A protein has these predicted regions:
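Conserved active-site and SAM-binding loop architecture
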Residues: 1-243
Length: 243
């Protein structure tokens, strides 16, 4: 994939990808609701940005060019799609053990409503990119019974089943949706990190926002992903591919 313009990195931890794009000589900026590390270029309510763009109102998307110019890579919040969230849809969930059945039901209905809202945002974001001819890659976890496996507008373009093989901290099977573009196929092997379990990480503080620990991406993984699946760029650690 050739990027003649700029890469726009959306949501938490996208700054890691931004930095690696810049190291590779590609201009990039990141956008997030939070700025916990003091490095975010643009602190925007991306949920409102998506809603406005979908409704035809002025938005950030108006400044993003289509065709072969710009690229969006969006690490869309997964908190209500994850398998852990799915386990909280049952009365028998451990978190509800001290609640009455009505209280359990209310908690479940609240979670389902939040999931519906974020599902809608993800679908709208992809629709906006599709209709405007903007290249976009959306990332979301793909382990066990994650909600999007059976309940999304289209299947993922590709799944990275073991991110540790490309230098990440987590195994964390991850799906990627490519809109108006196709992935290249390379394999830059780098398995040199101590494995971290998602269950050992802290939970997020508010709805739709994952904790920094759970969403952490290693710079090595970001660089290897960019070279393997976006730029088609060989590295010293690149392996031969069947594609």
């Amino acid at each position: 994939m050739e990027i003649k313009g700029k890469v726009h990195c959306f949501f938490e931890q996208s700054g890691t990808f931004k930095n690696e794009f810049i190291k590779l000589g590609i201009p990039a900026e990141d956008y997030d609701i939070q700025n916990n590390f003091g490095e975010t270029d643009h602190t925007d309510d991306l949920f409102r940005v998506i809603e406005d763009a979908y409704d035809g109102k002025p938005s950030l998307f108006d400044r993003i060019r289509g065709g072969q110019e710009d690229l969006i890579i969006a690490f869309f919040p997964c908190i209500y799609f994850s398998c852990l969230s799915q386990m909280s849809i049952y009365w028998g969930c451990t978190n509800y053990r001290k609640l009455s059945y009505k209280e359990r039901t209310n908690e479940i209905l609240k979670r389902v409503a939040n999931r519906e809202y974020f599902f809608g945002l993800a679908a709208k974001m992809l629709c906006v990119a599709q209709e405007r001819g903007i290249r976009l890659i959306m990332e979301n976890p793909w382990s066990q019974q994650t909600y999007l496996k059976a309940n999304f507008i289209l299947p993922p373009t590709m799944v990275d089943n073991n991110r540790r093989l490309r230098g990440d901290y987590f195994t964390k099977p991850t799906a990627y949706w490519f809109i108006n573009c196709e992935p290249t196929h390379g394999f830059s092997e780098q398995c040199d990190k101590k494995s971290i379990r998602i269950l050992d990480c802290k939970a997020g503080k508010e709805a739709g926002v994952c904790s920094e620990e759970r969403s952490m991406i290693s710079p090595d993984y970001a660089r290897n992903f960019i070279c393997d699946f976006i730029l088609g760029k060989e590295q010293i650690n690149s392996q031969l591919s069947l594609f």
